[in-house]
Amino acid sequence: TSGLSQPCCVSGGKPEGRGGKEMTAKKMVRNIEPDDPMLQYSGRIDDDDPKAPVLIYAASWVKMIFTGTSVAVTLANHHAYWTNEMGYLLDGVQGRIRLLNDGKKKTYEIAEQLPDARHELMLFKRMDACHTVTFYGFTVDDGADLLPPEPKPARRMEVFGDSVSCGEVSEAVDYVGKEDPVHDGQYSNSWYSYAWMTARKLGAELHDTSQGGIALLD
């Protein structure tokens, strides 16, 4: 697999297979609401409730540029099947968050003890509709600043597809040229999907309407 970092849940219990500590009440933090104008969204997202947008399809994302030394995210995972994980890019380094499956709002630590400087975070949906995720905002240091987002690309593209378009088993590098392995979703990563790789090559914003095992025409 890719060797991505595996942060822990810091509120509401620890995900299976992950170590970690709970966030202490002594730390002063700033909560960033989902409708903060400094946040930037893209993808197939249900935004009927601006305080609780739902990320549905793979490669949907929310970005934030912030200062400070730590960042966490509050999510509610709506599990259908497989083990569910969210992806992120923090200052260009990719990681993933193992989600709990009880449908309740939880706060997950992404990073702490960062250099006290400018940081760029993109939280993205690694997996297809094996789950949906309600986003309730980020948590940063008390006194941290949010900075304006970078402009989106002028070019936009939309992909309709199945597993290769949403990145299912895209991290199963030991099975190249072989039959797909039996898995529980751990190899799925939309970042390495044909759809998102093509969008990055073309410098385009992507809307990825894809689901593993489902064709446009049956």
Where are these regions (language model features)?
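N-terminal secretory targeting modules
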Residues: 3-9, 13, 18-190
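Short linear, low-complexity motifs centered on an aromatic residue
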Residues: 88-92, 209, 216-217
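Structural recognition of the beta-strand scaffold that forms the well-ordered cores
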Residues: 158-159, 206-209
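Solvent-exposed loop/turn segments at secondary-structure junctions
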Residues: 163-166, 212-216
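Short helix/loop capping segments that flank catalytic or ligand/cofactor-binding pockets
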Residues: 167-169, 206, 217
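Extended, H/D-rich, highly charged conserved domains that either
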Residues: 186-196, 200, 210
